């Protein structure tokens, strides 16, 4: 499983948290099992392989961190979504942006460019081209404004390598 696939699985879980009353830990306990992956994997190839320990740890950190910092991340989205009310933003796009912003803010081992590029690639799978451009614009503005070093921070070559 690649880091990008693990990120996408985390985004699915973050998206799901927006519809229920479950905590991040409750959702992770229910979803992060080999049995659940096998069940989902019958219809969704992304889940065909259960994550190894490192990948599972990454997914758990993303889901827990994004969930616990949700209000802060939503404030960033609202700040950079000029002309858009937060309620108008598609839920999947919001989950994607929250995840990328969490990685930029709280996961220093993930290059900013890798978090943003992967988020845009994932958005292309689920959203219209207009929403993908919106996601790219929000994340780009966020990083350029909040983190001046964005231009100098390289993308890891191994971002899509098997881990």
Question: Where in this protein do the model-derived segments appear?
Answer:
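N-terminal interaction/assembly modules
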Residues: 1-132, 136-163
């Amino acid at each position: 499983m690649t880091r990008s696939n693990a990120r996408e699985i985390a985004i699915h879980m973050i998206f799901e948290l927006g519809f229920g009353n479950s905590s991040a830990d409750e959702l992770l306990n229910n979803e992060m099992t080999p049995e659940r992956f096998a069940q989902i994997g019958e219809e969704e190839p992304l889940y065909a392989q259960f994550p190894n320990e490192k990948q599972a740890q990454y997914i758990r950190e993303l889901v827990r961190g994004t969930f616990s910092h949700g209000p802060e991340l939503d404030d960033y989205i609202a700040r950079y979504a000029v002309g858009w009310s937060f309620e108008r933003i598609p839920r999947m796009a919001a989950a994607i942006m929250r995840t990328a912003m969490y990685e930029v803010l709280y996961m220093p081992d993930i290059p900013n460019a890798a978090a943003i590029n992967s988020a845009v690639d994932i958005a292309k799978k689920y959203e219209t081209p207009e929403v993908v451009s919106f996601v790219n614009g929000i994340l780009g503005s966020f990083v350029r404004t909040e983190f001046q070093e964005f231009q100098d921070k390289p993308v890891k070559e191994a971002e899509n390598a098997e881990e």
